[in-house]
Amino acid sequence: MTDLKQMLTEHIGEKRDYYPLNQSQIGIYYYCKNHPESVAYNLPSICELPKQKVALSRLSAAIKIALNNHVAFRCKIVDRSSGPVWVLTDRSFDDFEIPVEKVSEEALTEIKNRYAKPFDLFGDLLFRINIYETEKNYSIISDFHHLIYDGSSCSIWFQDIAAAYYNGTVETEEVTMLDFCAYDDAYQKSQAEMDAISYYRDVFQGAKPRTSIPADLEENDLPGDGYCVYCFDKRIDFSKVSAVCNGRVGAFFVGAFAYAAAKYTGTGDAVVYTGNHGRMDERLRHSVGMFVRMLPVYVTIDESFSLTDYLSQVQERLYGGIKHGKCAFAALMQEHKLSIDLSILYQGDFFNHVPFGDIDCPWEALPLHGMDDDFVIMVFKEKEHFKLKVEYRKDKYKLQTVHEFLRAYEETVMTFIGETVSNEGGAV
């Protein structure tokens, strides 16, 4: 049996001239190289800080300290004959310019909607940062390419800014993105990789490889993407969901999503996709980079099963995928003819606000344009309800169809927790 912790240890601090992209990065790289105008893999966000509690000069200095703290921000892609690789530059962000601009709240709204722009994959930086000053707030708007950043990285980066602002020091990452890339390269040649391949062959044997909502439109009739927000019925509260799934709330929402997809498409099975943060070793807890693993979750629908049986199947597939999630995803998709059409990410209350000292700062992911998946649904836990933020291909789907499917998903969740359907939820 492969000792993955020891394998990671052997690659911490390893010095190379070039580092391979890890398996989470390689598919993103080729998509973006083939679609240079796309922002599908940008991660723009805004964090609002009250002006009366924050000094602008200290804030700018703290951002620079946070940037210097992580290797990922100093990495550059080089396209060699053997394929793309990372090169570590000696860049310092001590003199990095962070533009500051005074704007109205109305202007800020427009800036948020158009902030994401394509990155030059081979340029010096795969991120951009601005500070916008309104009457009440300093708003940090940032956009990081998914090649060097993920959701957990966002939390870590803001933690670093707060620590640098108040203490002048930050926690150093124990494992850098490049350490992990070297480890991932070794993993692909290990027995663990072979075991993961065997696991997925068993899961997908005889399975239908694709679940998709029937399209309303011919693709590209309406270029661009749609976006909507949908609030679940307020009676879907956290305690009811947690009781049904023994606290595994993320698995509950994935399972309900797969069930709704199977019923909506009239099939007896479904494959949907979710993500895992990929930081399965505690030494990665303060690492910034792209570590997320996409996981295909395949379920069969048998009406003779109890809800407990069904959710157990979902959890078995989900956590089996997490265990074997380092498998080369591109090869997995090719072998099993998989297509990422329906994706769901349970975010909980993680991204509603971020702490900045004793300040609870509003945080918001900004809209994108140019997505490749049919549907991407993010589930957020708020004070009174669960909220869905949905991006969809509007060259394929009418908004009415999106709302119909979300309603079917809501009805599934309500049924799972033993509630009847009302009109308390819906699009906002």
Where does each model-flagged region fall?
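Short amphipathic alpha-helices and their capping loops
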Residues: 2-36, 60-106, 125, 159, ...
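His-Asp-centered acyl/peptidyl-transfer active-site segments
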Residues: 15-17, 32-43, 71-73, 187-196, ...
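Active-site-proximal acidic secondary-structure segment that organizes catalysis
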Residues: 3, 20, 24, 132-178, ...
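Gly/Ser/Thr-rich phosphate-binding loops and adjoining beta-strand/alpha-helix segments
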Residues: 6-21, 38-58, 121-142, 217-281, ...
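AMP-binding/adenylate-forming domain of the ANL superfamily
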Residues: 16-33, 108-111, 154-155, 194, ...
